[in-house]
């Protein structure tokens, strides 16, 4: 660990040497290679060895100390690391892998060396925490004579461009210039958020976190910042609506047309993604209007508990409740024909969390979200009795659905909190399906449904959002949801009941 100054006066000498894999190399001070010295450098074992500290080579530029603690033992066999090979004439010192550390106060690490090539030298972006300027110059980051290849100095981040120059004294200066996020990002889905971030550039945690090393990392970070990947909560709400339909349809009649069903946490049927579980109750009241017409009223409520998001960029349910309201009408005709109409309204009030995790960032943004779902379904069906107790019902029809997703304001994630506006989605789907019902005489029964159909029409509004660290400017959200696809549903259930016991298994 170097907390002061290391001066190298001999040829082919090095400031640091790593003998094993369990130690640390730390440079919080300066390293000076004396005039006339050749073949020397920072690390004896080569560039792949990590040096920590303010003037290390890992780009972190954070002061660290290990000497106050018990130093690790050197293992019996040393690690094999490829060493840098000196030039044939031994005339140049090796700086490849050296990172010029910069700090929020505008200072930069300095290296004194003569007869050296600056190929492989880079500059980190620690300075961005202290300034909102998009162009900053650091003087004399490398001092000495016969310094070559200053123009090859690079930035540790794709967001910044480093331009090295040699001044009149022979020392090397570096100017760091910010690139536009729109010029660096290659994913078209993040273009609008990149534009907003460019317009609102300043020095805060959000912008510092975007100083990543590769274009792929920037694309991923911008997607997480925009919230476009946070889709699980509302998708799970749709799944929950289907679960209520199944629970209500399977409800056994208690008396006078009243049916009741319940499922509780701990039951495999009461599980959603991200370890979310729920308690759900379903009530159904059936009324006979005429000899050929029936009416059913449905109500249900569910209480949810979950662990939130388990995927970077996505969201997940942490709690909340849902309510379900249904009205069904059936008209029977001769020869087993039926005309079925159904109206549903579901409302979901959910607590959620969104994960933002890239680089050194690990944030959780909490929110309260609301989704309302309205559906009208009309279909014609014909029932065929294959044998006693076994019926098959093919059906076809159309479904109109409208979803309204409320706006929300996130909290607890600082600069990464999103303010999202409301959005809507309207679609018309065709329906073609087949139902199978079996009722045995020994207490066993089974049912299965296979349904599918193409989307006929789809319209959705454009959702926009703003992120706290970039001010109030808004950008478009592209969640990848489009119409024109094929919708499908498959369910199956087996039930056994007797006076002493009951068993029910459902799959979907």
Where do the model's predicted regions map?
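Surface-exposed loop/turn motifs in large extracellular/passenger domains
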Residues: 1-13, 17-94, 107-119, 145-150, ...
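Outer-membrane translocation/initiation segment of Type V secreted surface proteins
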Residues: 62-80, 94-112, 124-291, 369
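Solvent-exposed, glycine/polar-rich loop segments of beta-barrel outer-membrane systems
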Residues: 311-316, 351-368, 404-426, 456-485
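Outer membrane beta-barrel transmembrane domains
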Residues: 323-327, 420-508
């Amino acid at each position: 660990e170097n907390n002061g100054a290391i001066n190298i006066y001999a040829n082919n000498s090095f400031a640091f040497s790593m003998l094993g894999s369990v130690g640390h190399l730390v440079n919080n001070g300066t390293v000076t290679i004396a005039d006339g010295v050749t073949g020397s450098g920072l690390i004896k074992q080569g560039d792949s060895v990590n040096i920590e500290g303010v003037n290390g080579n890992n780009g972190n530029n954070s002061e660290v100390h290990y000497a106050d603690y018990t130093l690790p033992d050197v293992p019996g066999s040393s690690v094999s690391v490829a060493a840098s090979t000196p030039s044939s004439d031994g005339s140049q010192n090796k700086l490849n892998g050296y990172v010029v550390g910069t700090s929020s106060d505008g200072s930069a690490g300095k290296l004194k060396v003569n007869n050296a090539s600056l190929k492989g030298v880079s500059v980190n972006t620690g300075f961005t925490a202290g300034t909102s300027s998009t162009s900053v110059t650091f003087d004399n980051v490398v001092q000495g004579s016969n310094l070559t290849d200053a123009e090859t100095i690079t930035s540790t981040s794709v967001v910044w461009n480093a331009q090295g120059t040699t001044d009149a004294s022979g020392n090397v200066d570096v100017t760091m210039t910010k690139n536009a996020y729109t010029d660096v990002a290659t994913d078209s889905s993040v273009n609008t958020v990149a534009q907003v971030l460019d317009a609102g550039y300043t020095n805060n945690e959000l912008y510092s976190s975007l100083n990543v090393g590769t274009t792929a990392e920037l694309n991923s970070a911008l997607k997480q910042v925009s919230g476009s990947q946070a889709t699980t909560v509302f998708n799970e709400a749709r799944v929950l609506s289907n679960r209520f339909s199944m629970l209500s349809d399977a409800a056994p009649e208690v008396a006078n047309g009243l049916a009741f069903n319940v499922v509780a946490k701990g039951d495999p049927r009461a599980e959603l993604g991200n370890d979310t579980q729920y308690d759900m109750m379903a009530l159904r009241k059936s009324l006979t209007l005429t000899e050929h017409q029936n009416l059913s009223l449905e109500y249900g409520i569910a209480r949810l508990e979950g662990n939130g998001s388990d995927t970077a960029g996505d969201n997940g349910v942490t709690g909340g409740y849902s309510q379900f309201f249904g009205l069904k009408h059936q008209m029977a005709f001769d020869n087993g024909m039926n005309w079925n109409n159904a109206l549903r309204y579901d409302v979901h009030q959910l607590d959620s969390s969104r994960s933002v995790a890239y680089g050194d960032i690990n944030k959780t943004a909490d929110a309260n979200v609301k989704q309302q779902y309205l559906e009208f379904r009309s279909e014609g069906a014909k029932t065929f009795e294959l044998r006693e107790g076994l019926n098959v019902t093919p059906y076809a029809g159309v479904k109109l659905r409208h979803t309204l997703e409320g706006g929300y304001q996130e909290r607890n994630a600082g600069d990464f909190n999103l303010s999202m506006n409301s959005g809507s989605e309207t679609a018309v789907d065709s329906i073609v399906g087949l139902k199978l019902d079996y009722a045995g005489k020994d207490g066993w029964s089974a049912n299965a449904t296979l349904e599918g159909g193409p989307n006929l029409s789809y319209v959705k509004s454009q959702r926009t959002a703003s992120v706290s660290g970039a001010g109030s400017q808004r950008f478009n959200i592209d969640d990848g949801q489009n119409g024109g696809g094929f919708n499908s549903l498959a369910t199956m259930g087996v039930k056994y009941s007797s006076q002493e016991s009951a068993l029910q298994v459902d799959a979907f």
